[in-house]
Amino acid sequence: MYIILLFSILLMGLSNVIPQAPQTNLNVMSYNIWNGFDWGKDSLRRKNCIRWIKDKNPDVLALQELTGYNEEKLKADAEKWGHRYVKILKTNGYPVGLTSKKPITVKERVIDELWHGMLYCETYGIDFFVVHLSPADCNLRLKEANIIAQKVKESKSDKFIILGDFNAHSPFDEALLKDNQSLKKKYLKNKSEKYFNLRLGEFDYSVVSTFIALPSIDVSTNFIDLNERHTYPSSVLIGSYRKSFDEVKQTRERIDYILTSPIMAKSCVNVTIYNKGATETFSDHYPIMAEFNFKDEKYR
């Protein structure tokens, strides 16, 4: 018995001396949760979404539309999907936030210059820029993109991820968008005298192009077919903002992204947009998750 006890103590001591191998796999998810589950009133949708996130087990989660949330409330939810650490941009309007299995350091909160704001954090040794760009106007979005792109440049980081709801289209989706008259008509119908989502009546690619020019990599394009990349709208909008499933299908678009630095893109092994099944009922947006493997030391 004494020998067994002594052996156990020695093992415990060695575990504190032997260096732990660095984590080589990292799953990063972004999700717009649609008005913070109706400002917290839709408890069933919230409960089901939390359970789903727990099942997918991301290491880092960026959230948009945390309406009605503060850091304490976000922490309570995040602990249910296994994240001890949380940061939120603000507690009014439409906040963005970040949750993680490892400690998070806030490097900057940008609020006044942007429509919804941007949260710039570091976790897992990676710089995260959580964004939610203006839904109203292509010129406002381009202005925001230039501000955020400058922040990324100033960070001088070679390991960064820009992620969230960009409310903007990618030039890599142009082949699909150019013939989508239903979506174009919807944008034209929603225009006002002050704001325009189309640029001279056409889809605008300048916002996402601004980030690509940093350079950053749109990692979804390497893993997801053009026809399967839509992140909005889901069927949950039928009866309110969409009349039928046919209208949902006709107005599909990709406006949520995970963009990474070139060196991080080298370690990206998969991207999934969860635009089928249970996620039809959680939010008007679909979540996106990128998987990274850093086994190659030169990309760590």
Predicted regions and their residues:
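Sec-dependent N-terminal signal peptides
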Residues: 3-13
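Structured beta-strand-rich core segments of catalytic domains in phosphoester-bond hydrolases
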Residues: 63-143
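N-terminal, active-site-proximal structural segment of metallo-dependent hydrolase catalytic domains
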Residues: 2-3, 16-79, 295-300
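Active-site environment of divalent metal-dependent phosphoester hydrolases
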Residues: 35-38, 68-72, 136-138, 168-174, ...
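Metal-dependent phosphoester-hydrolase catalytic domains
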Residues: 109-110, 154-155, 172-300
